[in-house]
Amino acid sequence: MNAMQPPQSIEEIKAGLETTEKGGVRQSIRNCLTVFQCDPLLSGAIAYNILTDRKDIIKPIGFHRESTALNDTDMKYLLLYLEETYGLTNEKKIDNAIGIVANENKYHPIRDYLNTRVWDGTERIRFCLRHFLGADADDYTYEALKLFLLGAISRAFQPGCKFEIMLCLVGGQGAGKSTFFRLLAVRDEWFSDDLRKLDDDNVYRKLQGHWIIEMSEMMATANAKSIEEIKSFLSRQKEVYKIPYETHPADRPRQCVFGGTSNALDFLPLDRSGNRRFIPVMVYPEQAEVHILEDEAASRAYIEQMWAEAMEIYRSGRFKLAFSSAMQRYLKEHQRDFMPEDTKAGMIQAYLDKYTGSMVCSKQLYKEALNHAFDEPKQWEIREINEIMNQSIDRWRYFPNPRMFSEYGRQKGWERENPATDSGNPSEKTMDGFVEVTEQMELPF
């Protein structure tokens, strides 16, 4: 079948329709299809929008319309037109024909937009967040925004592809963070900030038809439990959902990416294992070159060229939807600036800085570093110490085979990577084994 057959005159179409034995027009899907494919008004008018998962009317068809999506009022006009012009009155057959012709005339508005951008050769991704929001113009900020843009492009062209990163813009109220995400979506209907609950059975409806989705309220009230829920939500590649008028549920691959905004600096709950899905960028509106709404047309033109630049990278295929190993290490350190202070890690680090031995165990750290001399650690407290040593403390290497500790028996633990020497005053040795010389110390020569 070809949904885009050359239009014919109404009389030619009528002459080609199937008829009943009595000479009347047959109420068949085939006849309805012929009309939608060949009628000069309706040919090419109905299409399936891959982004919204809906049928659209994409050209004028003789009556005023407010949006492209096919709605109940449109159906009434179409039924009237087919009845008066061709004598076709079976609503179910007409609806089935609309479904077929739309399915054979698919389009994706974001793909069409991206494919028609032409880059002028001027680099903008590297400087965009500095330009609009006053962020640092460093490699991290560049890689963060580039990764987010490529993730958005990939989700448009390859729905459901693995991309579980959230770009988080952090800074004072009024900086333009939410506006940045809205303009980044190009069209307002491709943007949403209406995602409130992640466990809603109808969450697909909140994602449907949108490309850039901002999470603001959830990030503002995030705690350890909700962050885990957000992580799990970001890792999904599809929703399974049954549209009300359909019979069976279907997989709905994701075509959107998620951005976060927060006015609070310490918006990430303490997580020593890392929050690799969250990429925070600090913004300083007083350092911005322009406010993003100062000249909205100019801002949109800048963003359009930025998408064109990102498409050049996408077409080249020379990218990964993940940070490099070096940037991952930087991210892990950088994220600590956006978490509450880890007081227990600080106490353990202070203890180890003065400790002169070459190995420690978790029980020792519980009693001596965390000041529980007369208590026995619970299992969760041991796990917490292990996590601190493995994730937050440098220069100590874990050993899995138990060794003998004079006060704690045989224990697994950690050994110093660069053991201190035994000479001099042990309490004042530095991490590399040297003794710091103060002004009060008398030199022995």
Q: What are these model-predicted stretches?
A:
Residues 270-288:
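A short helix-turn-beta junction within AAA+ P-loop NTPase domains corresponding to the substrate/partner-engaging
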Residues 1-124, 143, 375-376, 380, ...:
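N-terminal nucleic-acid engagement/recognition segments and initiation subdomains in replication
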Residues 98-208:
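P-loop NTPase catalytic core of nucleic-acid-dependent motor ATPases
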Residues 313-357:
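Conserved alpha/beta core segments of nucleic-acid transaction machinery
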Residues 203-208, 243-261:
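AAA+/SF3 P-loop NTPase mechanochemical coupling elements
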